Amino acid sequence: MMKNLPLIISSIIVGIILFQSALVAPAINRLINAEDASVFLRYIWPKFFLIIAILSLASFVVIAINSYQNLYKYVSIVSFVLMLICYLITPMINDAKDSLNDQLWTALHLSTIILTFITLIINALTIAYWKSVS
């Protein structure tokens, strides 16, 4: 079980990203007025990034303790760092939106989208290739 825990964690990460990005965020923007959506999204996105960062760190620890699959050790730490960056720049995104700095908001928001997409891809690749190295 412990040997495959990083695989399970990557599966959870992929599920969280797909659920949040494909279902929750678009539904919020369509179903809730802009002011309430803003409050909710500012509440949920930092937690989203933090949960994935913690899961990635947990995966890294399990792999490091069991001392196997070095590639996935690096993948999990990259996943952790990318989500930590997203978490840390979220307040800057909110400040840019509040100060009507659309250019900065767009750049920072796009960076979180790209970093989250990279996190999705590397965790999906972990799922796809895990069996071939186990």
Regions found by a protein language model. Name each.
Residues 1-59, 91-103:
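Interfacial loop at the N-terminal end of multi-pass membrane proteins
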Residues 3-9, 66-75, 129:
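Alpha-helical transmembrane segments and their helix-start/interface "positive-inside/aromatic belt" motifs
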Residues 5, 9-12, 74, 111-118:
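Physicochemical signature of membrane-embedded alpha-helices that form the seven-helix bundle of GPCRs
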Residues 18-31, 60-67, 87-90, 124-134:
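Transmembrane helix-loop junctions and nearby membrane-interface residues
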Residues 44, 104-119:
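Individual transmembrane alpha-helices with interfacial aromatic-anchor signatures
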Residues 50-74:
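Helix-adjacent hinge/juxtasegments
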Residues 52-59, 115-128:
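Hydrophobic cores of alpha-helical transmembrane segments in multi-pass inner/ER membrane proteins
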Residues 67-102:
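Mid-chain, well-packed structural core segment of small domains
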